Regions:
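Intrinsically disordered, compositionally biased charged tails
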Residues: 1-3, 226-279
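Ribosome large-subunit tunnel/peptidyl-transferase-proximal elements
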Residues: 1-233
Length: 279
């Protein structure tokens, strides 16, 4: 069963593309028709592509990996922040920090700096500083929070990137391509889909359009997280139900095997020395 449907996408305005003169020929397979100089996206293909992307995102979440959402355009920022946060995924809605992926260690240092400032604030270290110094540090902390606060929990490179508007976020897409990180994206008729692994052809300028697609994709991520949680509970239960002493017996057997191997090796060494003496 599909995670979305034609009518839902139609009502959200997902079918509206850009003016014909602004189109990217690579998007031709996803265009249904032209009306009043505007390209209309084939929503049947959008439904199929949403399902394809959602299934892949579910597996990524189920494996315990992170998906980084990227949307710095005004129409998408708020909805992306809400949807990504709802499934505990990192997101970037302010200016994309150049080198965020290709120079990830430097970004992590900035995040750690933010944590250090918090620690020094809590332990009273700043009580010995002047008001001016405290103000400077506070401003620095606020700037770091604005740009990097939403990725504070991203301790390693994400396993995928989900982008709203690949034309605007071309630097992020380029960095992901360079590192071999899969790119999921809502791609409008004016954009190039060639650098995107999972293309979702749809209107990327309307908040409602972005929202309905994120509902389906984040719903799949939530399912993956739930399945991972259930599997973990089952594994823990299986461990508790294992016969008492099973682990101990296994360790004892391992020690016995090792002792036996050492005894055999010692016997071989003794035999070798004896042969050497007789010679």
């Amino acid at each position: 069963m599909s995670r979305t449907n034609f009518d839902t996408l139609l009502e959200a305005g997902c079918h509206f593309g850009h003016l014909k003169r602004k189109w990217n020929p690579s998007m031709a397979p996803y265009i249904f028709m032209e009306r009043n100089g505007i390209h209309i996206i084939d929503l049947n293909k959008t439904v199929a592509k949403v399902d394809e992307a959602a299934d892949a995102l579910k597996q990524i979440a189920k494996s315990g990996k992170k998906v980084l959402f990227v949307a710095t355009k005004k129409q998408a920022k708020q909805v992306v922040a809400e949807k990504a946060a709802s499934v505990n995924m990192p997101y970037v809605i302010e200016r994309w920090p150049g080198g965020m992926l290709t120079n990830f260690p430097t970004i992590r240092k900035a995040v750690k700096k933010m944590a250090t400032i918090d620690k020094l604030t809590n332990d009273g270290t700043y009580s010995n500083l002047s008001k001016r110094e405290v103000l400077q540090i506070s401003r620095q902390r606020a700037k770091l929070e604005k740009n990097l606060g939403s990725i504070a929990d991203l301790t390693r490179l994400p396993s995928a990137l989900f982008v709203i508007d690949v034309l605007k976020e071309n630097i992020a897409v380029r960095e992901a391509n360079r590192l071999g990180i899969p790119v999921f994206a809502i791609v409008d008729t004016n954009s190039d889909p060639s650098n995107v692994d999972f293309v979702i052809p749809a209107n990327d300028d309307a908040t409602k359009s972005v929202e309905v697609i994120l509902d389906a994709c984040c719903g799949a991520i939530a399912e993956g997280l739930e399945e991972r949680k259930a599997e973990k509970v089952d594994m823990e239960a299986a461990g508790e139900n294992a016969p008492k002493g099973a682990g101990k017996k296994k360790n004892t057997k391992a020690r016995m095997d090792k002792a036996e191997e050492e005894a055999i090796n010692a016997a071989k060494a003794a035999a070798f020395l004896k042969e050497d003496e007789e010679a």
